[in-house]
């Protein structure tokens, strides 16, 4: 299939990029779609950027369709994070006559890229685009984890997918290919106790923004476990990201978003990183677009510094620890990477579930989880996924 039929070239008048000789910039390194007869060759690419210029299903945030080229305006001017990068920018997916046509195009594009082993950065566009991203993995038959950096849960009702209810539509798909959904950064006054209880009943993982800000290292295992990391820019506080129709005075700081983005880039498992709901019409002198460009830069920098140290690949690169929990009559197996000092722990389940969820039975964790087990306590993360795998 010719992917170029789904794309339009980048609007250079908005990007306004010019090469500078005094230092190599990211824009000099990316193979970019700027002329109709010169679509980038993806055969050697390992990372692709795509924009989606559609905001018709973004609730109360019309204008976010134009975000991709505004982000590129700042992204291309940043320094090259790595000397040898096989990176392409395929331009922007052409909006269909109906939103569902845009969704179909995104599904096809994601399917083709993921099937080639290419990791994708998606610049939205509205949050509803997470639904067609999920559908692409469904076509590939991959059971996935989604990490949503969002101040809300996106579980509202409605027959048509939109930015406020895409999660509801994902969990209603049958057969279902969602193993876990992680929300990082919800704000209680936006979601309410009933919705928090519902997320708990669904056995999804949720973390308040204040809880994570107390120690941002806790976000790393959550991101490392995710196939898709989707950022709603409203999760970042208004002072750092004003370009959204429903901003909040509270939320993550811009540098914390960059930290999360780098964790996602470093994750061997993450194959899609998306940022949505940035509305340039509401921006302050490009402040939000510039901050998001930094987050994308950190994802790229992390991606090209991946350690490929997921356990089971080569025993010489990790250590295995078995911790006996005497008071509980059980043991937990931990793995530590010798390359990156990152940790994982095994969660047992029956053979049928292990075969279906084989990519999800080894849980990323922190050294603190190992320490807790050494003190004869079962880590909360282990309990959560034990209950999920053995439900």
What residue ranges belong to the model's regions?
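Conserved alpha-helical scaffold segments that buttress catalytic/binding sites
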Residues: 2-49, 56-275, 279-391
